[in-house]
Amino acid sequence: MSVADIKKGAEQKMQRSLDAFKNDLSKIRTGRAHTGLLDHIQVDYYGSPVPISQVANLTLVDARTIGVQPWEKKMVAVVEKAIRESDLGLNPASHGDVIRVPMPPLTEERRKELTKVVKSEGETAKVAVRNLRRDANEQLKKLVKDKEISEDDERRAGDDVQKLTDKFVAEIDKLVQTKEGEIMTV
């Protein structure tokens, strides 16, 4: 394994950690509506659970309302029940064959709770990135031990890995700050 492979592998893994963190953040509800909020909801479709996006069309009606239009009329009640029973605390209302899902405003207490969750998720993501840095540095040390590269090369590569780590940690911090801003905006 070469130094370039180690750096490239570390960067790819750090990017995956960042993507997973972004995905986790998208599931945290702010006061604003977005269709991604309902992505993880499973609907019972003829006896098997399927994602809501596979049985209905999701649209934004306005900044605080999601419109859900099941493709089959008989699925309206099932989809509405699945949304109501989700852990999001939403109260959907059906109007004919369209379900409107209004986003209730967040209470001050809930906002503070959510910012703590966001910070905690951010810390977890940063720890994952730092662990990847440690793994890359251990691989570099092994190359030195096996006399495949010099200590100077290891130091230079280690500095590059540190720069990557700093870049991803800064990106995570930025995402945390942005999400906190979204949550605290009334």
From Swiss-Prot:
Function: Responsible for the release of ribosomes from messenger RNA at the termination of protein biosynthesis. May increase the efficiency of translation by recycling ribosomes from one round of translation to another.
UniProt similarity note: Belongs to the RRF family.
Disulfide-bonded cysteines: none
Swiss-Prot/TrEMBL GO biological process terms: cytoplasmic translational termination
Main location: cytoplasm
Record flagged with keyword Cytoplasm: yes
Gene Ontology molecular function: ribosomal large subunit binding
Superkingdom per UniProt: Bacteria
Keywords of this entry: Cytoplasm, Protein biosynthesis
Protein name: Ribosome-recycling factor
Gene name in the database record: frr
Species name: Paraburkholderia phymatum (strain DSM 17167 / CIP 108236 / LMG 21445 / STM815)
Subcellular compartments: Cytoplasm
KW Cytoplasm (keyword) present: yes
GO cellular component: cytosol
